[in-house]
Regions:
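Short active-site segment of divalent metal-dependent hydrolases/proteases
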Residues: 73, 122, 261
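Conserved beta-sheet core of the metallophosphoesterase superfamily
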Residues: 173, 185-189, 196-203, 208, ...
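Core catalytic region of metal-dependent phosphoesterases/phosphodiesterases
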Residues: 51-68, 79-197
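A glycine-rich, aromatic-flanked flexible loop/lid motif
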Residues: 164-169, 215-216, 220-221
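Basic, amphipathic N-terminal segments that precede the first structured/catalytic domain
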Residues: 1-107, 296-299, 303-322
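Short, motif-level signal for alpha-helix interfacial/capping segments enriched in acidic residues
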Residues: 45-53, 96, 148, 234-245
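Beta-strand-turn-beta hairpins that frame and shape the catalytic cleft
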Residues: 57-65, 218-227, 269-270
Length: 322
């Protein structure tokens, strides 16, 4: 009898535990439903009058800043990563012009600022540079001047207000030893004067030959103060400080070449934009284990400053066969 009573009590406890567990599930469900009811009762459905009165943006018009940096005209490259010669240079510039046409149309650009950011020629400053060259330095200058003039003339088809600014790069030094070089005595400094004569009959194109210094310059694009340099004497991290101290006023945008790859960073509120190269990966870059496609940068400027930046690829990456 005692064992039966003990067994009965055990079963009663089991039943109570099961009932408690079941009730807990019911309580959780009830609480969840209560929370849903509370939320539903607290929410007021949207009414069209509740939305903000959005004022439609009216475009202020746009300028384009079209970079043309590090062509390295005269170089001959034939590697697994890149092929480059005069004909390929022409093809890449044609690709660039076509893409700029689309950008002009997309943003209804009213004016184009073309920045020649240096190293338009390959020069003869290093032994490996001289080995790569297919043309001597004078031929390189003439070829680059004609190709860049054609580039600007083609842009004129879609925009009749074009200003051209230029700075020389380190590859156009007259003397290979940079300690012997006189600032401003670079070979590619001749290119803007060639362009000025070549383009003189196209009203609306102005090739600027006066600048603050042979190594950097500046201009206004709508309301923005824009500075530019080749990049061999400055880095993206210090160029804002350097040039701000030189001009004694805040700078909105700085454009650099030299490093052969597109990029953008912000330093103290100033946008530093780097434009890549047209020549593509050379033996020097391969030695550093760096490889990228030929590329240039195009900036769209409105009255408020930089609106957008285009990463323009001039060619697809090479397929490496191992």
């Amino acid at each position: 009898v005692a064992n039966d009573i003990q067994r009965l009590k055990i079963e009663q406890i089991k039943i109570r535990d099961e009932r408690a567990a079941t009730n807990k599930v019911y309580r959780d469900i009830a609480r969840a439903e209560s929370i849903k009811d509370i939320i539903a009762s607290a929410i007021v459905p949207y009414d069209k009058n509740d939305f903000l009165n959005i004022v439609q943006y009216e475009g202020s018009g746009h300028d384009l800043i079209v970079c043309l940096s590090d062509l390295h005209t005269g170089a001959g490259i034939d590697s697994a990563w890149n092929k480059f010669d005069k004909e390929i240079l022409k093809a890449r510039l044609e690709s660039y012009v076509t893409q700029v046409f689309n950008i002009v149309e997309r943003h209804a650009a009213e004016k184009i600022h073309v920045l020649l950011l240096g190293d338009l020629i390959n020069g003869h400053i290093h032994i490996n540079t001289r080995v790569q060259n297919n043309e001597n330095s004078i031929e390189q200058v003439m070829t680059a001047a004609e190709l860049v003039s054609n580039f600007v003339a083609e842009l004129y088809e879609v925009c009749q207000h074009i200003d051209v600014y230029s700075v020389s790069g380190n590859h156009s030094r007259v003397f290979p030893n940079k300690d012997e070089q006189v600032v401003g005595d670079e070979l590619e400094a001749l290119i803007p004067f060639y362009m000025k004569a070549r383009l003189q009959n196209l009203a609306g194109i102005e090739v600027k030959t006066d600048k603050l210094d042979p190594t950097f310059g500046g201009f206004k694009a709508r309301n923005s103060l824009v500075m530019y340099a080749h990049g061999d004497k400055d880095s993206p991290s210090n160029v804002v400080e350097h040039l701000t101290m030189m001009v004694k006023q805040p700078i909105d945008l700085v454009f650099l070449g030299h490093r052969h790859t597109n990029g953008m960073t912000t330093v103290h509120g100033t946008k530093v934009i780097e434009s890549g190269c047209v020549c593509g990966t050379d033996s020097f870059a391969v030695g550093l284990r760096k490889n990228d496609v030929p590329q240039q940068a195009v900036a769209v400027i409105d009255d408020g400053g930089l609106e957008c930046l285009y990463d323009v690829k001039l060619e697809k990456p090479a397929k490496i066969v191992i």
